[in-house]
């Protein structure tokens, strides 16, 4: 059976609800690996259905003959403990390429209290990756989590054996990093210093997934033999960062060298690059197959070269300080773009913003604190073209002029801050600022 349910062709919610039946098993291909995974429909509501992840994970598309061997996927990776994952998901976002394999009996499950989106194969992928880790390290990790009150001595300090993160106050006291082997639950290292033993230690500890390295002085940061999933790093001296295939998130902070290159086995495919920019500078880091890019602290930035550097983006997130964004029409070149978010950015019109037909894969459009004229036109233009759209806090030129240096501007229009509280707080800030400026003027005089 090879039925494709296409909800991205503006299929009504009622039609999706009628197509789905309890017991139906659907299959999809996970994007990064192209492997097939499966899930089953186990409950139907008014606007949402409950699915449960199944344990099918293969390079071969499943057939009806595979149904009898499928079981609920039990999660044991990271903090999960033999847990079945099932979740409510909206009919209107049912995945476009889901293929109906057949229908089998469901098994008893407790009431579903999880709400989210349809599966993407990440749980099956995580399970496979977790099962490839050294068994003794995984076993020690799970034991440490189960003994949350068990304490040990590290660098002369008493800490919990399940401790997740260590900082320089501990690292600087170590004469031998092997002392950290007493911490099987260790998953994050945060440092502002150079520790010669750190990288070799990371290379043999497979469950340490995060490194935050501030003000790194190395020119060549070789992490290629580590097992890091996330890296946050800063340092003007860095010219090369070498990553393992396992790294999926890298965050760059502070001033960056114009020579900076990032080397990854997958060249950025299925990787998230976050950059907290200074002076709107974004070096050409490589990663030509990058799929997710998030730029923060934009002040005055052009997208002119961005799309040629990263032509395969699925997700583009842009956040101002607030700031101005130029050459917005360049986004039309990102034909695979599925998600676009913009926040606190100005300097563009509705005419410059891409037309829906130029972004055929776009499913999510989140715009907040953008020019009011553009916001109104874009919202109307995309209303029937994307499933997930939020256009919030449209701003006029007058508002921008008055609030450019207002630290409370994020409260204006917030659903969490009432208008009266914002007005009172703004008045207090203005009065405090006036007094401060008067005091500075008197001291200078």
PLM regions and their residue ranges:
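Core of folded catalytic or high-affinity ligand/protein-binding domains
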Residues: 44, 441-445
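Mixed-charge, Lys/Arg-rich low-complexity intrinsically disordered regions
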Residues: 1-21
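Short terminal alpha-helical segments
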Residues: 395-441
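Basic/aromatic-rich interaction segments and small domains that mediate binding to polyanionic partners
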Residues: 43-67
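Concave beta-strand-loop units of leucine-rich repeat
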Residues: 143-376, 380-397
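Short beta-strand-centered aromatic/proline hotspots
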Residues: 34-45
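Intrinsically disordered, low-complexity, charged/polar segments
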Residues: 60-138
């Amino acid at each position: 059976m090879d039925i494709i349910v296409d909800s991205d062709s503006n299929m009504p919610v009622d039609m999706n609800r009628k197509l789905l039946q309890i017991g139906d098993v659907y299959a999809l291909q996970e994007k990064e690996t192209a492997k097939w995974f499966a899930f089953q429909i186990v409950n139907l509501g008014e606007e949402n259905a409950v699915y449960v992840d199944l344990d099918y994970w293969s390079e071969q598309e499943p057939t009806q003959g595979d149904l009898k061997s499928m079981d609920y996927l039990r999660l044991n990776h990271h903090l999960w403990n033999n847990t079945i994952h099932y979740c409510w998901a909206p009919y209107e976002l049912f995945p476009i390429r889901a293929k109906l394999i057949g229908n089998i009996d469901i098994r008893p499950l407790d009431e579903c209290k999880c709400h989210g989106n349809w599966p993407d194969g990440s749980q099956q992928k995580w399970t496979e990756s977790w099962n490839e880790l050294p068994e003794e390290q995984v076993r020690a990790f799970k034991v440490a989590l189960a003994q949350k009150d068990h304490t040990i001595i590290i660098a002369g300090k008493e800490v919990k054996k399940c401790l997740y993160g260590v900082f320089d106050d501990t690292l600087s006291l170590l004469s031998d990093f092997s002392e950290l082997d007493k911490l099987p639950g260790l998953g994050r290292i945060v440092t502002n210093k150079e520790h010669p033993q750190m990288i070799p230690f990371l290379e043999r500890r497979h469950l340490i997934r995060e490194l935050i390295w501030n003000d790194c002085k190395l020119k060549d940061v070789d992490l290629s033999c580590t097992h890091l999933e996330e890296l946050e790093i800063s340092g003007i001296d860095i010219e090369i960062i070498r990553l393992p295939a396992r790294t999926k998130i890298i965050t760059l902070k502070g001033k960056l060298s114009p020579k900076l290159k990032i080397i990854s086995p997958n060249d950025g495919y299925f990787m998230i690059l976050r950059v907290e920019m200074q002076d709107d500078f974004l070096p050409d880091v490589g990663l030509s197959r990058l799929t997710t890019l998030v730029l923060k602290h934009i002040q005055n930035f052009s997208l002119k070269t961005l799309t040629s550097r990263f032509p395969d983006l699925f997700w583009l997130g842009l956040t101002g300080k607030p700031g101005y964004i130029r050459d917005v029409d360049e986004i039309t070149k990102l034909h695979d773009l599925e998600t676009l978010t913009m926040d606190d950015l100005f300097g563009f019109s509705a005419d410059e913003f891409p037309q829906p037909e130029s972004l055929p894969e776009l499913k999510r459009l989140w715009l907040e604190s953008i020019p009011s004229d553009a916001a109104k036109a874009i919202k109307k233009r995309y209303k029937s073209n994307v499933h997930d759209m939020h256009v919030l806090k449209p701003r006029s030129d007058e508002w921008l002029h008055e609030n450019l240096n207002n630290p409370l501007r994020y409260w204006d229009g917030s659903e969490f801050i009432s208008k009266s509280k914002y007005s009172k707080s703004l008045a207090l800030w203005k009065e405090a600022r006036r007094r401060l400026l008067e005091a500075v003027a008197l001291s200078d005089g």
